[in-house]
Amino acid sequence: MLIHPPRITTEPYYIMKNRIYLFTVAVASFMCISCTKTQTTLSENEKTVNPPIMGWSSWNAFRVDISEDIIKHQADLMVKKGLKDAGYHYVNVDDGYFGKRDDNGIMHTHEQRFPNGMKPIADYVHGLRMKAGLYTDAGNSTCGSMWDNDAAGVGAGIYGHEPQDAQLYFGDWGFDFIKIDYCGGDALGLNEKERYTSIR
C-alpha cells in the first residue's frame, strides 16, 4: 500500500501531521543508511578473516594402509572436486610411511608403500600448489604400532631424534608441516605440556 504525504496547509493539525510524517521518514532513512553501512563494514571484516587450517589426512580413511599412489590420488581429488579452491590446502601423510631407523638413527620410508621415498610426495603436492605434511609421535613409537600392530611404527617416533628428524622431514624431504601425535609419549608417561614445549 502506497502512503502519500498529507497536503500542506496552514492549519496547525496538518502542519503537525506533516512534521510527524517528515520525522518518520527521516528516522527510517537514517536507519536504512545505518543498516547499509553496518553490512558494508561486516563484509569488509569478513574479507580479512583468515580461514582455519583445512586439509586432508590419510589416517581416518586408510590407517597405516597407505602408499605413494593413494596419497597422490587423494591430492588430485582435492583439486578435481574443488576442495582446494574452497580453501583445503593441506595434505597430511599420516602414520604408515615409516620403514625403519638405520644405525645412525636416520628414518627411512617403508620400501613397499613408498618405494621412491617421501620427497616425490612433497614435490607432487607442491606441484598442485598445496602444502605437504607428515606424521610423527612425541614418544618412541607411533599410534599405528599400538592400534594397528604396525611393527614399522616401533621406534619411529621423534623422541630423542628431534633435530635429526626435523632436518630430514623439512630440509631433505621438503615437507611444510608436521603432525605430532601422543600415543608414544603417553606410553612413556611423559608430561604432555613439557614434551610439546621442548619439541617447539
Give the role of each language-model region:
Residues E68-I71, M118, Y196:
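Generic preference for well-ordered alpha-helical elements
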